[in-house]
C-alpha cells in the first residue's frame, strides 16, 4: 500500500471515529496528552511542522499545538481582506456593487475566475467570492488594491485582536514561504483570534458577518471537509505556498448546531521549495481532533 493510500485509509478511520464522537453526549474523554502525542507522531511521519488551534465555541474545549510557531500565511489572508471590504461597505466607504476592471496584464497564476473575466468588470462582491471560494489570486490583488494594499491587512488584523499576522507582499510573491522569513506570516494562535472575530465575533455587523459566512461556506478549495463526518460543513479559507506550506482556517458546523473553530498551519521540514502540499494532512488533522472537541 502506498503512503498516500495508507493516509487515505487513516483519514477514513478517523472520520468514522469522529462520526461516533459527534453523536455522544456527556463529558469529553481526557485527550490532551494522547492528541499531543499523535500530533508529534504525524510531524515525525511526514517530516512536517504543525501549528493547530481547535476549539468548541460552545463548550470551550480546545486542542492546541505549536500555537506560536511562525508559518507562511499564504491565501488565508483572503479571509481578512474580504472582511475588511465588508467592513468598509458597512461604513459607507465603498459599495459591494462597485465595479472593478480586470486588466489582462494584471493577471497572476491561479486566477480561474478573473482569467475568464479579463477585459471586463467585476463587482467587489464578485471579487470577494472569487478570492474566498476559488482562491483566485488576481481577485485577491484587486481586493488588496481596494482596501489599501498588504499593510491594510496587517492593520485589520490588529483591529480584530490578532497581534501577530502581517502581510507584506502581493500575490503571488507572498507565497514564497522561505523558512525564517517573517514576511507574510502568522501563527495558529493569531489566526484563531482573527477568524473567530470575523466569523463568530463582533468585527462585522450581523448582516455582514452572515454574508462572509455564506461566501466561505461555498468555498471550493476546503481541505478540512475531507476529515468531517456526513452532515458537517465549513466556512473556511485555505492557503498553500512553497516548502509544502498548507493552511486552512475557519469554522466547522455540525448538524446539531455544533461550531468548532479550526486553524491548521503546516509546512515541510525538507527544505525543498517544491515540496508537495499537505492538503491530505489537513483532512487527517480535522478528523483527529473532532471527537475530542465534542
Curated annotation (Swiss-Prot):
Changing residue 82 to S: In amoxcillin-resistant strain. One of its GO terms (biological process) is beta-lactam antibiotic catabolic process. It is an enzyme of class 3 (hydrolase). Pfam families: Beta-lactamase2 (PF13354). Predicted to be exported by the Tat system. The position of the signal peptide cleavage has been experimentally proven. InterPro entries: Beta-lactam/transpept-like (IPR012338), Beta-lactam_cat (IPR045155), Beta-lactam_class-A (IPR000871), Beta-lactam_class-A_AS (IPR023650), TAT_signal (IPR006311). The keyword Plastid does not apply. GO terms for molecular function: beta-lactamase activity. Keywords: Antibiotic resistance, Hydrolase, Signal. It comes from the Bacteria. The active site is at 75 (acyl-ester intermediate). The keyword Mitochondrion does not apply. Substrate binds at residues 237-239. Its EC number is 3.5.2.6. Residues 1-32 form the signal peptide. Residues 226-247 are annotated as: Disordered. It catalyses: a beta-lactam + H2O = a substituted beta-amino acid. The class A beta-lactamase family has a specific amino-acid numbering system, sometimes called Ambler or ABL numbering and often misspelt as Amber. A multiple sequence alignment was used to derive a consensus sequence and then the consensus was numbered taking into account insertions and deletions. This allows use of identical numbers, e.g. for active site residues, despite differences in protein length. UniProt always uses natural numbering of residues, hence there appear to be differences in numbering between this entry and some papers. Belongs to the class-A beta-lactamase family. PANTHER family: BETA-LACTAMASE, BETA-LACTAMASE-TYPE TRANSPEPTIDASE FOLD CONTAINING PROTEIN. NCBIfam families: bla_class_A. This is Beta-lactamase.
